From Swiss-Prot:
Compositionally biased spans, kind Low complexity: 12-25
PANTHER family, per the entry: ATP-DEPENDENT RNA HELICASE RHLE-RELATED, RNA HELICASE
GO cellular component: cytosol; nucleolus; preribosome, large subunit precursor
Family membership noted in the UniProt record: Belongs to the DEAD box helicase family. DDX54/DBP10 subfamily.
Documented EC number(s): 3.6.4.13
Location of the protein in the cell: Nucleus, Nucleolus
Name under which the protein is recorded: ATP-dependent RNA helicase DBP10
General function of this protein: ATP-binding RNA helicase involved in the biogenesis of 60S ribosomal subunits and is required for the normal formation of 25S and 5.8S rRNAs.
Domain Helicase C-terminal: 368-522
Length: 914
């Protein structure tokens, strides 16, 4: 190579590090103001703090050699360099620290991209999932939002794809439920594939179909899409998905909730049976388990232990309430128990300015899309409380969200709200207000709360007790994280008491009533022992709030309802929604219902809660009991002066009445005393046993580690087991015939996916409770017959799976687009044409005419001569002897028309005299 020549390949390789750094930094600045539903976990927060410091990247030519080369240029890099660049470090993985990204055997370029992102240690879901995906296993991962599950499936997919395939066809598909989540996942894919020639695109609804046609013609390797638009493009473009190697269902529970089940089943049929399927979800509803059984091959269920356990730093309190006093209990808990401060005028003004500013930004975006957004305050980091009193309130339906939010705002609190069908922009705005401490309370439903994750919370309040113990764990698990303390308060009425007893069995923590604790203190005092302390971590302490305070809170609620008509209307709607919610809620166990009746019969279940100390109401009741035990019991009818004779008819009537009911009262008193003796006998036995036991053994025996090892197999050991080396070719090897009994035994094994999924399955009720009557028929005058009221006149076509899909999916727009651009149809599996790069310059245009009065006349003349040599005609420029003498019929016709026009215009009589 001469001195004047320039090596483009080496220059690009040297500059790759600096370019990628600038891209990362610019992308980071754009996202800082964006508040998204998915919030990183504690480990990711620590690593993200180091993102501000740019990592030092060596300028060795290890970047992908042909990253910026056009299709016509040759890749001069040696094959050994490329092999070394993409080599997975299996030898180094054995030397790497266990549990690190390097221990997974990832390639060098992927480890560099991970380091650029600032990630140092994998999260628990990544540590358990990535090795299984690398072993080509189908995985069902249960992980809440913010646990790092996006990287858990993106990293192994990128590692296994490595580089762009010259064959036409998509190799990896990632399906997301919403546009925002798809864009967020696509951003992660772009960052992790930086430095490779892997092509990735995103397909979401609302974007131009023509642009998406162009994107699909670039032969992408990774496709991130929403199911509706992807199915639309598949049908419209008649895509063949036989080249798909990996399919990922992200937030799969939300995919089914949002009505994508038909699209997913249609896509599942089109996929090849040899693909690897990955399914990630925060919960496992039954429909999702059925889908996993049908669409996945021998899947592995990955669950984190934290998903089914309550933090040992969590303290719980359960408050009993009457049917009409739930709102009063909520206000009392917020004001007196949590000590929630009321909003000041400055805080209200600041919140209004924020909301008005967001509305102004929306209007400005419609008028001037290029206008820079307003700078927002940065929310609290993931390991810090948004505010000292940050509280999340769970309600059953979206109607309750509107009602409770309005009630608390009228009471003077700063409140944000989120429910399932809330607009995405409003959802982000409400979440930002809570995380940036503009508000202290967030009112949500179970469906909406599963899509967000607030890393650190001070308190959780259950407006109603959920119908499932697993949903309760999912709720209260949002506080007391990362070693922080937290409180969970639940409001329970008599209908929800059986669910509390189910929760008692599920958690292994006994219910503690006020009367039980007082008897325990009395027994300890008689035996000379110190009074036991109330443990809100190990017991489910049940009781009511002080009666006087509840009455004052109820009076406040009545005043708010009396003075606010809209609040009364919303309350009525919420009450109707609550009726539907109770109707569709799964019932409690029969045994818990029986025990709940026994507890309510004792009358001790709604005594004042131990959290509030001595009960003043009880002293008043004791005084009234003394009056009831007085010897002379006279009614107002029997009151008379001394010496007066009993001649009054009313006095005689009361004496007769007393004689009649005396035996009934005596039997009732004896039965009550007998029940009290039986209860006390069992209670005394339980209390003495608990005193002799340790604090952590509340009525239950603990197994030691040896017993557990004999019964269960350790999941980490199963993961670390190495497969025996075999020389079988899986493509041709046929195993022995297994009889039906062997197959049945294998399906009935305790370690099967069905049993594990059944243990983790629970359904969340929809927060928008509307009664649907699908079989109501109505008379159609035009058709002259009864038709289903829910039916529509939409036209459908039959898809590959036999299901009906909208006929608008096949509108012919792709064929029109392809013909207008003279593009060849996609042939899946064929070699791609090298000249089909999207940004390659392919247009051949004639140069401009050279102008003698310009300085570049000679340069332009050379361009024209070169174009003429290439056969491109330049308008107005002809070489000597180049002008065509023979004319076409069209030229002759036009010439005749011009001649006739000139003749008609100029053929005037001559002025000369003849």
């Amino acid at each position: 190579m001469s001195d004047n020549e320039y090596d483009i390949t080496n220059a690009l390789a040297l500059d790759a590090g600096s370019d990628s750094d600038s891209d990362v930094s610019s992308g980071r600045e754009d996202v800082e103001d964006d508040i998204q539903d998915e919030i990183i976990s504690d480990d990711e927060e620590k690593s993200s703090s180091s993102q501000n410091k740019k990592p030092k990247i060596s300028t060795k030519p290890e970047s992908f050699p042909s990253l910026e080369l056009s299709d016509d240029e040759d890749d001069e890099s040696r094959p050994s360099e490329v092999a070394e660049y993409f080599s997975n470090n299996k030898l180094q993985a054995t030397k790497a620290k266990a549990g690190s990204f390097a221990s997974f055997g990832l390639s060098k370029f992927l480890l560099k991209n991970i380091a650029k992102k600032g990630f140092k240690q994998p999260t628990p879901i990544q540590r358990k999932t990535i090795p299984l995906v690398m072993e080509s296993r189908d995985v069902v991962g249960m992980a809440r939002t913010g646990s790092g599950k996006t990287a858990a499936f993106v990293l192994p997919v990128v590692e296994k794809l490595k580089s762009h395939s010259p064959k036409v066809g998509v190799r990896a598909v990632i399906l997301s439920p919403s546009r925002e989540l798809a864009l967020q996942t696509f951003k992660q894919v772009k960052e992790f594939t930086k430095g490779t020639d892997l092509r990735s695109i995103v397909l979401i609804g609302g974007d131009s179909l023509e642009d998406q046609f162009s994107s699909m013609m670039t032969n992408p390797d990774i496709l991130v899409a929403t199911p509706g638009r992807f199915l639309h493009l598949k049908v419209e473009m008649n895509l063949d998905l036989k080249t798909v190697e990996y399919i990922v269902f992200d937030e799969a529970d939300r995919l089914f909730e949002m009505g994508f089940a038909e699209q997913l089943n249609e896509l599942l049929v089109a996929l090849p049976p040899s693909r690897q399927s990955l399914l990630f979800s925060a919960t496992l509803p039954r429909s999702l388990v059925d889908f996993a059984k049908a669409g996945l091959s021998n899947p592995v269920l990955v669950r984190l232990d934290a998903e089914t356990k309550i933090s040992d730093q969590l303290q719980m309190a359960f408050f009993t309430t009457k049917r009409t006093e739930r709102d009063a209990n909520l206000l009392y808990i917020l004001s007196e128990v949590i000590k929630m401060p009321l909003a000041t005028q400055d805080q209200i003004k600041k919140l209004k300015e924020l909301e008005e500013g967001a509305d102004d930004d929306d209007s400005d975006e419609e008028k001037k899309p290029k206008k820079k957004k307003r700078k927002l305050e940065k929310p609290a980091p993931a390991n810090r409380l948004p505010s000292e009193h940050s509280t999340i309130v769970f309600v059953p339906t979206k109607h309750h969200v509107e009602y409770v939010t309005t009630l608390l705002r009228d009471a003077g609190h700063l409140v944000s709200y989120i429910y399932g069908t809330l607009d995405q922009h409003a959802r982000k705005q409400q979440l930002y207000q809570f995380r940036a401490a503009y508000t202290n309370i967030l009112v949500v439903t179970d469906v909406a709360a599963r899509g967000i994750d607030i890393p650190v919370l001070a308190n959780v309040v259950n407006y109603t007790l959920p119908g499932s113990s697993k949903i309760f764990i999912h709720r209260v698990g949002r506080t007391a994280r990362a070693g922080n303390k937290g409180w969970a308060y639940s409001i329970v009425n008599e209908k929800e008491l059986p669910y509390l007893l189910d929760l008692e069995l599920f958690l292994g923590k006994k219910v503690l009533l006020t009367q039980m604790h007082e008897k325990k203190v009395q027994i300890c005092h008689e035996k000379g022992l110190s009074a036991p302390e109330v443990s809100y971590k190990d017991r489910l302490v049940l009781g009511s709030a002080p009666r006087v305070d509840i009455e004052s809170s109820q009076e406040l609620c009545d005043n708010l309802l009396r003075n606010h008509y809209e609040l009364r209307t919303i309350r009525d709607v919420a009450n109707k929604g609550e009726i539907l919610y109770y109707r569709t809620r799964q019932p409690a166990s029969q045994e818990s219902v029986k025990r709940a009746k026994e507890i309510m019969d004792t009358g001790a279940w709604d005594d004042q809660h131990l959290l509030f100390g001595a009960n003043l109401e009880k002293e008043k009741e004791k005084f009234l009991a003394k009056l009831a035990d007085r010897k002379v019991k006279e009614t107002v009818f029997e009151f008379r002066n001394k010496g007066q004779r009993d001649e009054d008819s009313l006095v005689e009537f009361m004496h007769k009445r007393r004689r009649q009911i005396a035996p009934i009262q005596r039997r009732a008193k004896e039965r009550k005393q007998l029940l009290e003796k039986e209860r006390m006998a069992g209670l005394t036995h339980g209390i003495e046993n608990e005193i002799l036991k340790g604090d952590g053994e509340v009525g239950y025996d603990n197994y030691n580690g040896a017993d557990l090892d004999e019964v269960f197999e350790d999941g980490d050991e199963a993961l670390s087991k190495k497969k025996r080396k075999t020389y079988r070719d899986p493509q041709f090897f046929l195993s022995h015939y297994a009889p039906a009994s062997v197959i049945q035994d294998k399906q009935l094994e305790l370690s099967s996916f069905s049993n594990e999924a059944a243990a983790a399955t629970y359904d969340l009720d929809n927060d928008d409770k509307t009664q649907t009557n699908k079989q109501i028929m109505r008379w159609d005058k035009k058709k002259g017959k009864y038709i289903n009221s829910q039916s529509t006149d939409k036209k459908y076509i039959i898809g590959e799976s036999g299901q009906k899909i909208p006929a608008t999916y096949r509108s012919g727009r792709y064929e029109d687009w392809r013909k207008s651009r003279n593009a060849q149809p996609l042939r899946t599996g064929a070699e791609e044409v090298k000249s089909n790069g999207r940004f390659k310059h392919k247009k051949v245009a004639a140069p401009k005419m050279p102008d003698k009065f310009r300085d570049d006349y000679h340069k332009q003349k050379k361009k024209v001569e070169k174009a003429l040599d290439a056969g491109v005609s330049v308008k107005g420029y002809n070489r000597p002897g180049q002008q065509q003498e023979l004319r076409s019929t069209e030229q002759i016709r036009k010439a005749r028309e011009l001649k006739e026009k000139r003749k008609a215009k100029n053929a005037r009589p001559s002025k000369r005299r003849k």
